[in-house]
Regions:
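Short, charged cytosolic
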Residues: 2, 67-81, 156-166
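Alpha-helical transmembrane segments of integral membrane proteins, especially early/N-terminal helices
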Residues: 23-32, 61-71, 98-110, 144
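Hydrophobic alpha-helical membrane-embedded segments
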Residues: 38-46, 51, 63, 67-73, ...
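Alpha-helical transmembrane segments and adjacent TM-loop junctions that form the membrane-embedded core
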Residues: 7, 92-321
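Residues that define the loop-to-transmembrane-helix transition and helix capping
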Residues: 27, 53-56, 208, 212
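Acidic (Asp/Glu-rich) catalytic motifs at the cytosolic membrane interface
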Residues: 49-78, 82, 116, 179-193
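Aspartate-rich (DDxxD/NDxxD/DxxxD) Mg2+/diphosphate-binding motifs
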Residues: 76-95, 125
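Topogenic membrane-insertion module of multi-pass membrane proteins
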Residues: 2-7, 13-43
Length: 321
């Protein structure tokens, strides 16, 4: 079996240029979300203190958790870029999956569980809102800021998903850090809508129960998003293949190559932003060992040109499956 890496020899363990470009785009998206959530967290915290709104307090906790989460994602991306070595011969690309899972836990606990706790507490106390218009103003500002953050993330997502529906992309993407950012932004935008409706309903009716119900709804929303993200990231942690469309495209590409008579097996493994590929195939060239090696080299080069995410490539010629 032959094993090759791109573009440097295996000992270098350098990150591919295509992966670096992807991470640069995602880093910009995360920093944009971090800035938006930092401003929103401060505004929500002040509004919660002045108005006594538990929905607003739940949203402040949510935004604060989001800031911490985005910091963890940046840490995970930095760690995933460490070069390969003797202990980690395929590099540290999957480190981003671990930190994405930690983010899901943070969203579940600091966001969801805290919001439900505050909602239940408010149901028992029945404390009325003070200065509700402050809460409304901050919520309107927060919706605008979160919408801008979501728009920034969706610009990158739309370039990646092509003709896929958003739901299918969320289920099949291997970009865990982008999945987390989009999930958080969607949850934040919907959660803010819940909080705004709860505060307005409390203002109109004078009944603080609506504010408590808003906090409970936000908590359940965050827990739902956290569970979804956690399940998807767990698959990547265990060791998931490249996206189905990519795997199928690689198989078609190999089957159409003149050098390949039959593909016995194709294994792909997503390793952060890079892909590990193992191929077992029967080659058409059988004249000599040198001719066979040359045919494999041509096939490998063509595969890398067509799929630049491929960093590690193992190619085994054989005559039986």
């Amino acid at each position: 079996m032959r094993a090759t890496t791109q573009p440097a020899p295996p000992a270098s363990g350098t990150i591919s240029g295509n992966a670096m470009a992807k991470r640069s785009d995602t880093t910009t998206t995360i920093l944009f979300a971090l800035l938006a959530n930092g401003l929103i967290a401060v505004a929500k915290g002040v509004a919660a203190w002045l108005s006594g709104s538990t929905s607003m307090l739940a949203e402040a906790a949510h935004s604060l958790a989001d800031c911490g989460n985005q910091g963890l994602l940046l840490l995970g991306m930095k760690r995933s870029m460490r070069p390969a070595d003797a202990d980690y011969p395929l590099g540290h690309g999957r480190a981003i999956y671990f930190w994405s899972f930690i983010v899901a836990l943070m969203l579940f606990s600091m966001g969801g569980v805290f919001s439900i706790y505050e909602g239940l507490h408010k149901l028992g106390s029945g404390t009325p809102l003070a200065n509700p218009w402050i809460a409304v103003g901050v919520l309107v500002f927060s919706v605008a800021a979160e919408s801008a953050s979501l728009w920034k993330a969706m610009v990158q997502v739309n370039t990646l998903r092509g003709t896929q529906s958003l739901w299918r992309w969320l289920r099949e993407t291997r970009r865990s850090e982008l999945l987390v950012v989009v999930g958080e932004d969607i949850a934040a935008t919907v959660g803010l809508s819940f909080a705004l409706l709860a505060v307005v309903a409390t203002m109109v009716t004078g009944n603080p129960v609506y504010d408590a119900l808003g906090s409970l709804a936000i908590g359940m929303l965050l827990i739902g998003v956290a569970l979804f993200v956690g399940i998807e990231v767990t698959s990547l942690l265990v060791g998931q293949s490249a996206e189905p469309a990519t795997h199928a495209a690689m198989m078609r590409f190999l089957q159409e190559r003149d050098e390949v008579a039959e593909v016995y097996n194709l294994i792909t493994l997503q390793n952060g932003a890079d892909v590990v590929v193992a191929v077992k195939a029967r080659m058409t060239e059988r004249v000599s060992a040198l001719a066979l090696v040359d045919a494999i080299n041509r096939c490998e080069h063509a595969l890398r040109m067509e799929f630049p995410d491929v960093r590690w490539l193992f190619f085994e010629p054989d005559v039986t499956a």
